[in-house]
UniProtKB/Swiss-Prot annotation:
Belongs to the UPF0423 family. The gene is tpd. It is a lipid-anchor. This is 34 kDa membrane antigen. GO terms for cellular component: plasma membrane. A lipid is attached at C20 (N-palmitoyl cysteine). It is found in: Cell membrane. Pfam families: Iron_transport. InterPro entries: Metal-bd_Tp34-typ (IPR018470), Tp34-type_sf (IPR038482). Residues 1-19 form the signal peptide. This antigen is a pathogen-specific membrane immunogen. Its main location: membrane. It comes from the Bacteria. A lipid is attached at C20 (S-diacylglycerol cysteine).
Length: 204
């Protein structure tokens, strides 16, 4: 998720105040502008995101993985732990890259109707935890995500996102000569993975 500053309205008010006044009032307005603190890029939204690792490009998709505090959702996805039960919320931010143009997407467009599953495997363990991601919207737009409880606790994990194309009965592509796209959806899930994700517990 991208952070959104809540300080914009204060800055706009100060600017209007300084523009309307004259002389000493104008100077006072400039002082007000100077007093408005600059947004903190890391904390402007009131929370911090933590990357799972570097973003990945797989096929026509640019995939980012981040986590932060558990969230409340409505309606609540049935298979996910609640905000109170979960350790964190994990997001897959999936947008089209340059290759996505062949499917009719613009670079940076959110790609809808995907089926995204995460697999978490702690180093040294044979157990693989499967997490079904759901499409959802936050204040900054759509993503795929889930509240997650790490079943094997703190440690280093391999994290794997498997991203299946939209199902044939839910999403179609134009393929005629006049209006069609040149690309086709992938037949096997695309994979974005990180081998050394360190889960240290809540950092917020």
């Amino acid at each position: 998720m991208k952070r959104v500053s809540l300080l914009g309205s204060a800055a706009i008010f100060a600017l209007v105040f300084s523009a309307c006044g004259g002389g000493g009032e104008h100077q006072h307005g400039e002082e007000m502008m100077a007093a408005v603190p600059a947004p903190d890029a890391e904390g402007a939204a009131g929370f911090d995101e933590f990357p799972i690792g570097e973003d990945r490009d797989v096929g026509p998709l640019h995939v980012g993985g981040v986590y932060f505090q558990p969230v409340e959702m409505h309606p609540a996805p049935g298979a996910q732990p609640s905000k109170e039960e979960a350790d964190c919320h994990i997001e897959a931010d999936i947008h089209a890259n340059e290759a996505g143009k062949d499917l009719g997407y613009g670079v940076g467009d959110f790609v809808p109707y995907l089926r995204v599953v995460a697999f978490l495997q702690k180093h040294g363990s044979e157990k693989v935890q499967k997490v079904m991601f759901a499409p959802m919207n936050a204040g900054d737009g759509p993503h795929y995500g889930a509240n997650v409880k790490f079943e094997e606790g703190l440690g280093t994990y391999k994290v794997r996102f498997e991203i299946a194309a939209p199902s044939h009965d839910e999403y179609s592509l134009h393929i005629d000569e006049q209006t069609g796209v040149s690309g086709r959806f992938w037949s096997e899930p695309l994979v974005a993975e990180w081998d050394d994700f360190e889960w240290k517990g809540p950092q917020w």
